[in-house]
């Protein structure tokens, strides 16, 4: 089933079109990189659609607000975890102006090292969110393993729960093998799997 999706010319064209957008983001300015960081912080433990809606609601105001004001805006936007994410976003906004320069310098040399740096130094970001962020700014060699992808792996008969870094890397290794077999970059594989389960490409 997954192979047939990857070989589907129309779907593959849509995925490759998204990949071009990611690669263009890599050349974009700090504002775009910061936007993607905000989106990935909001996407954690939330749906992409909810996160995207809230990001658009707060993005042009967040740099001028304190934590409480960010929390109120998130609540107004309908976002569920408004207090927790306000705390993360308030810390993240202090990185504005340094996000692209700092991360690109590392990621251009080693994408896995860049992910480790992000997951270690940016509050509210784990391996999945760091991989998602890096993919969205043009680095396609890391797996984004959300609940849809985890369900796909579990349906293969592999009981991984992603409760540790070790399990994430194990799942990523499996997905990398599948991606290589299908001749697609692992950073795009989740788009095919997400489409298989939801019939949409949004990420």
From Swiss-Prot:
Domain of life where this protein originates: Archaea
GO MF, any single term: class I DNA-(apurinic or apyrimidinic site) endonuclease activity
UniProt keyword terms in alphabetical order: DNA damage, DNA repair, Glycosidase, Hydrolase, Lyase, Multifunctional enzyme
Gene: ogg
Similarity comment text for this entry: Belongs to the type-2 OGG1 family.
Active site per database record: 128, 146
Site, Important for guanine/8-oxoguanine distinction: residue positions: 203
Protein name as annotated: 8-oxoguanine DNA glycosylase/AP lyase
Record EC number: 3.2.2.-, 4.2.99.18
Originating species: Sulfolobus acidocaldarius (strain ATCC 33909 / DSM 639 / JCM 8929 / NBRC 15157 / NCIMB 11770)
UniProt catalytic activity: 2'-deoxyribonucleotide-(2'-deoxyribose 5'-phosphate)-2'-deoxyribonucleotide-DNA = a 3'-end 2'-deoxyribonucleotide-(2,3-dehydro-2,3-deoxyribose 5'-phosphate)-DNA + a 5'-end 5'-phospho-2'-deoxyribonucleoside-DNA + H(+)
């Amino acid at each position: 089933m997954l192979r047939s999706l990857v070989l589907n010319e129309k779907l593959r064209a849509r995925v490759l079109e998204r990949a071009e957008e990611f690669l263009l983001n890599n050349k974009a300015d700090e504002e775009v990189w910061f936007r993607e960081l905000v989106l990935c912080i909001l996407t954690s433990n939330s749906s992409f659609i909810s996160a995207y809606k809230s990001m658009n609601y707060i993005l042009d105001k967040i740099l001028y607000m304190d934590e409480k004001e960010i929390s109120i805006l998130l609540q107004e936007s309908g976002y569920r975890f408004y207090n927790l994410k306000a705390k993360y976003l308030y810390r993240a906004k202090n990185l504005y102006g340094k996000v692209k320069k700092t991360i690109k310098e590392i990621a251009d040399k080693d994408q896995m090292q860049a992910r480790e740096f992000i997951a270690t130094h940016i509050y509210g970001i784990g391996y999945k969110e760091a991989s998602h962020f890096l993919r969205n700014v043009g680095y396609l060699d890391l797996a984004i393993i959300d609940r849809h992808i985890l369900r796909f792996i579990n349906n293969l008969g592999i009981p991984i729960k992603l409760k540790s870094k070790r399990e994430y890397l194990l799942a990523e290794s499996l997905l990398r093998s599948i991606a290589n077999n299908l001749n697609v970059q692992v950073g795009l594989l989740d788009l095919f799997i997400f489409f298989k389960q939801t019939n949409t490409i949004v990420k």
